[in-house]
């Protein structure tokens, strides 16, 4: 199944983040009027790839639900308009970016005896082995961060919103984690047979045969919306210049 493929038999992650820095300062978010504080969550993974997420707490918490906002390939503050919207509504917001983007690093590793900088998702195919799938880079940080939140907070529901690559993540992640109640995927995915234009081809993670032989996109849509109080909403804009 999906979890076995992603974590090669090790099971769904139960660990906690490698680092939590509480109440940090980031000038890029200074103008969010209902922002009380930011906690920085770092998850370290194989080949020195990391994930840095921000947990943004509202001054006035009017809702007891957590919003997971995934920027995709954009800079970590690229979704500030959407983040502001949810903060102003009184939600706590957990912000992620895709691997190798945003605040996440681009490590230099040894690959076939040469120093190689990881800066593109299509390089991940060279890291595959019988004991490791790079698909874990896309979903493990969310799982590990939610483990921390489970342990330290008592939110009623977790909802997820993502655009572009974040929209793809908002499809696959709820398919493997029942903790996500309602997911919104914006310009996030198309079944492979509908990708008739070059711009729709997608990166490594969008087209990996071994992954989609286990669960194709239709399967993922069902899995992401199956269960008590689970929903998946996909948004496609006809004149979308993003993706």
Task: Outline where the language-model segments fall.
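N-terminal cap/lid segment of alpha/beta-hydrolase-fold proteins
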Residues: 13-61
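The conserved beta1-alpha1 loop
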Residues: 56, 65-72
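The feature captures the conserved acid-bearing segment of alpha/beta-hydrolase catalytic domains
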Residues: 191-243
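Loop/turn elements at helix/coil->beta-strand transitions in domains of secreted/extracellular proteins
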Residues: 63-66, 89-92, 155-158, 177-182, ...
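Primarily recognizes the serine-hydrolase "nucleophile elbow" in alpha/beta-hydrolase
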Residues: 143-206
């Amino acid at each position: 199944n999906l979890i076995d493929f992603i974590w090669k038999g090790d099971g769904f992650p139960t660990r906690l983040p490698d680092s939590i820095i509480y109440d940090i300062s980031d000038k890029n978010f200074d103008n969010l009027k209902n922002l009380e504080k930011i906690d920085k969550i770092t998850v370290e993974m194989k080949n020195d790839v990391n994930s840095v997420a921000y947990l943004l707490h509202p001054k006035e918490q009017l809702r007891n639900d957590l919003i997971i906002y995934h920027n995709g390939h954009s800079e970590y503050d690229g979704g500030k308009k959407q983040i502001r919207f949810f903060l102003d509504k009184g939600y706590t917001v957990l912000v992620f970016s895709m691997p190798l983007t945003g605040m996440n690093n681009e490590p230099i590793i040894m690959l076939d005896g040469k120093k190689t900088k990881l800066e593109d998702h299509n390089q991940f195919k060279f890291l595959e082995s019988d004991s490791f799938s790079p698909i874990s880079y896309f979903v493990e940080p969310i799982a590990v961060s939610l483990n921390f939140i489970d342990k330290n907070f008592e939110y009623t529901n977790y909802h997820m919103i993502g655009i572009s690559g974040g929209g793809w993540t908002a499809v696959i992640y709820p398919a493997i984690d029942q903790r996500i109640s309602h997911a919104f995927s914006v310009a996030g995915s198309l079944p492979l047979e509908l990708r008739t234009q070059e711009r729709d081809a997608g990166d490594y993670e969008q087209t990996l045969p071994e992954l989609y032989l286990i669960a194709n996109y239709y399967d993922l849509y069902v899995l992401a919306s199956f269960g008590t109080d689970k929903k998946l909403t996909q948004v496609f804009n006809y004149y979308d210049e993003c993706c």
